[in-house]
């Protein structure tokens, strides 16, 4: 009985050690892969299109605001037949950014009071 118990403890120890090494290998591989993807993205990055500027050449080139990326929006200006595409921020995202900004400011005030 002691032999079975000793063998079981040894088996569990070896299994946990091998799985921990495998996880470390996976973490290192994921980290290396992530770094290479970031380097490729930085090399591929180009200048973004500012808000309210024409984005018809590339609809995915709109700049990011503080939290969200602007969207290339198509519309017809009043009294015109030509379609216009500009980078704009949707209203619901604008309101979410304002709420997040107010929450951040309020959090700073609380930190001053109790910090």
Curated annotation (Swiss-Prot):
Belongs to the neurotoxin 19 (CSTX) family. 01 subfamily. Residues 21-44 form a propeptide. This is U3-lycotoxin-Ls1u. It comes from Lycosa singoriensis. One of its GO terms (cellular component) is extracellular region. Disulfide bonds join 48-63, 55-72, 62-87. Keywords: Disulfide bond, Knottin, Secreted, Signal, Toxin. Its main location: secreted. PROSITE patterns: SPIDER_CSTX. One of its GO terms (molecular function) is toxin activity. It is found in: Secreted.
